[in-house]
Swiss-Prot record:
Taxonomic path: Viruses, Duplodnaviria, Heunggongvirae, Peploviricota, Herviviricetes
Comp. bias regions, Low complexity: 59-70, 140-160
Primary localization class, coarse: virion
Keywords: Host cytoplasm, Phosphoprotein, Virion, Virion tegument
SUPFAM superfamilies: EF-hand
Highest taxon of source: Viruses
UniProt function note: Plays a role viral replication by forming a complex with UL26, thereby contributing to increase its stability. Mechanistically, prevents the proteasomal degradation of UL26 by inhibiting its ISGylation.
Family the entry assigns: Belongs to the herpesviridae pp85 family.
Annotated organism of origin: Human cytomegalovirus (strain Merlin)
Record-given protein name: Phosphoprotein 85
Bias (Pro residues) ranges: 625-634
Subunit structure: Interacts with UL26.
Feature: compositional bias, Basic and acidic residues: 46-55, 635-656
Length: 656
């Protein structure tokens, strides 16, 4: 049985992204056919690849084959007309095929029939390319009148040729993701990656560096770093005091450098996360202040009473477009706190309870005497949401009921949040200065390592350039580039087969720089001077660099200033003398290793290592796994820094 085919003219402006439903054997009126056979879409739908449809089982092996393809009834995503009879919904798929080739251009606005809302089907999210075989077949069938559908068995259904760029029939059954679903999926993947990375941002501290931290830290200290990386707002000095890594599986000479690099990694990660969190806090408080709740509260504030004037002052500071100082916020919060204290009841939480409830979420937050525990727990949830990078409106008591007590509680909380954000932003600036100070200290420590191991010349020169850019530039990109450079230098130091004693070398430099005072209580004459003691310290064969051959004359010099007490301290002043270590002294520190002594020194070093591992206060424990290899050096802007280093070398700043 074959149904009678009708042809109708296409409405002007109708988009080409329409889906036609196969018709049943029953004939229907033309009006119902015009209304129910077309499902318009608000945006263009792109056809799916032939290979994707074949892999999904939605089309036969060849699109242009004689075997017809089929598709099920189109399921509307948001409409209400999905409960109609199948006989009313199924229409011929090739009935309007001649009009498709000569229709309006793709992407033209839809013009649904007056009084009828368009039925929208969500387009698939899979990109597509122009179809090769099906496109030509669609044009041929369209020119022949659109009656080329075949039936091979009772289970086969009618199909329409697919025009280039037109949605195929099988796309009606494909599952598609909306934009919000994709954003949620990406956010969840990012959260999982950060959680596996101990809370470190992958763009700040690479995952391979985090694996090294897991290897050198104790298990309880790994969890401690994870809690610190949650970036709970706190003072800068509190953060620097909490970062105290407990090392494991680290050589004694490498602990000082490893501890400083880990501390730097934790603080710079906190700095990065805190910047993003502060921006989200500002957005959340601005959204809340400009919301309908605060507007309704401002409309009912009475300036005739004392509490009304305190509320009006707080609203003025919250909605002001000019800059508000910390003193102004503190004055407003103090006046609101006085009004809340007068309205307190025996059931109201004490200030000690308020601080104990909120201290785990924000240490910088300024609290007040809230009148109810419901308000306290509500504001605790808001602080927790702010820690989770919430950018929407904050929940207030005035949403349910606007009264004087709720207004004072909400305004005290909002003013406290504004004051907290101001101090949090100031803490972020303090952390940046502290990071630069820390890099200066690490640079001096790395130079002491280089003086003992001159074979690290190129590595130290590269690190010095990175640190110089980090402490001299105002943008954070140069500051973030210092973290991989420090881990690269640590990787090179770990590969050295030598004892690293930075404080011992610094003591020798102090003795060499200040040789004018003989040792007290020694009558040995000039042979007991501090210079000779310093030379004896640095010429120990066990401190020699086993890889250094002729690099001593190419030692990079650095200005080192040694401080010592100059005279008898008084009750008002302690005189201190600063003496610099000359370049000649640095060039003559270590003697070269004679070839006949290298084998003997190697055996002595092995015996000393075994002794230190057996008698150290941090013995080497059983390794959980071999230490992960750190990646090779890959610095950003390397060409620019190399060019800058060559210019400095040519100008004489490097002593080669």
């Amino acid at each position: 049985m074959s149904s009678r085919r009708r042809s109708s003219s296409r409405r002007s402006g109708e988009p080409s992204t329409v889906i036609y439903i196969p018709s049943s054997n029953e004939d229907t009126p033309a009006d119902e056919e015009a209304e129910d056979s077309v499902f318009t879409s608000t945006r263009a739908r792109s056809a799916t690849e032939d290979l994707d449809r074949m892999e999904a089982g939605l089309s036969p092996y060849s699109v242009s084959s004689d075997a017809p393809s089929s598709f099920e009834l189109v399921r509307e995503t948001g409409g209400t007309g999905a409960a109609k009879k199948p006989s009313e919904k199924k229409r011929s798929s090739s009935r309007r095929q001649p009009q498709i080739a000569a229709g309006a251009p793709r992407g033209s606005p839809a013009t649904p029939k007056a009084g009828k809302s368009p039925k929208v089907s969500r387009p698939p999210s899979v990109p597509s390319l122009p179809e090769n075989g099906a496109g030509g077949g669609g044009d041929d069938n369209s020119s022949s009148g659109g009656s080329s559908s075949r039936t091979t068995s009772n289970s086969s259904r009618s199909t329409s040729p697919v025009a280039p760029g037109e949605p195929s029939a099988a796309e009606g059954d494909e599952f598609s993701f909306c934009d919000s679903d994709i954003e949620d999926f990406e956010r969840e993947c990012y959260r999982v990656s950060v959680a596996d990375n101990l809370g470190f941002e992958p763009s700040v501290v690479a995952p391979q560096h985090v694996e090294y931290l897991k290897f050198v830290l104790q298990d309880f200290d790994v969890q401690h770093l994870r809690r610190l990386n949650e970036c709970i707002p706190m003072p800068a000095f509190a953060l620097t005091s909490l970062v105290d890594p407990v090392l494991n599986n680290v050589a004694p000479g490498e602990r000082d450098l490893t501890r400083r690099i880990i501390t730097h990694a934790v603080i710079i990660n906190y700095y990065y996360v805190a910047q993003k969190k502060a921006r989200h806090m500002v957005e959340a408080i601005r959204t809340t202040v400009r919301g309908d709740t605060v507007r309704r509260v401002a409309a009912q504030v009475n300036n005739q009473s004392r509490s009304g004037r305190a509320a009006a002052l707080a609203l003025h500071f919250l909605t002001s477009r000019k800059g508000v100082t910390d003193g102004q916020y503190a004055t407003s919060l103090r006046r609101l706190d006085e009004e809340l204290r007068h309205r307190g009841t025996p059931e109201s939480p004490r200030l000690t309870e308020v601080y104990q409830t909120l201290r785990d979420y924000n240490v910088l937050f300024y609290t007040a005497h809230y009148t109810s525990r419901g308000a306290l727990y509500l504001y605790r949830q808001n602080l927790q949401r702010l820690n989770e990078n919430h950018r929407g409106m904050l929940r207030l008591l005035s949403v349910e009921e606007i009264c004087e007590e709720h207004t004072l509680n909400d305004l005290a909380f909002l003013v406290g949040v504004e004051l907290m954000i101001t101090h949090f932003q100031r803490t972020i600036r303090v952390l940046r200065c502290y990071l630069q100070h820390q890099l200066q200290s690490i640079s001096e420590l790395c130079y002491l390592i280089y003086v003992q191991l001159p074979s690290l010349r190129e590595d130290y020169a590269q690190l010095s350039d990175v640190i110089y850019w980090a402490v001299s530039q105002n943008y954070d990109y140069a500051l973030y580039a210092s973290t991989p450079a420090l881990f690269d230098f640590l990787r090179v130091v770990r590969q050295q087969d030598a004892f690293i004693c930075t404080d011992y070398v610094y003591c020798a430099l102090r003795l060499l720089a200040c040789p004018d005072r003989p040792i007290i209580g020694d009558t040995g004459g000039s042979s007991s001077s501090q210079r000779l003691v310093g030379e004896f310290m640095v010429r120990d064969p066990l401190l020699r660099d086993p890889r250094a051959t002729h690099l001593r004359q190419k030692l990079i010099t650095r200005d080192i200033c040694v401080a010592r007490l100059q005279a008898q301290p008084s009750s008002r002043h302690i005189p201190v003398e600063h003496t610099g270590v000359s370049s000649v002294t640095l060039l003559k520190i270590f003697s070269q290793v004679p070839p006949d002594e290298r084998e003997e020194d190697t055996l002595r070093e092995m015996a000393l290592k075994a002794f230190m591992e057996a008698n150290g206060n941090h013995p080497e424990q059983i390794c959980r796994s071999p230490p992960p290899p750190l990646p090779p050096r890959d610095y950003p802007q390397r060409d620019e820094r190399d060019r800058h280093r060559r210019d400095r070398r040519d100008s004489g700043e490097y002593c080669c």
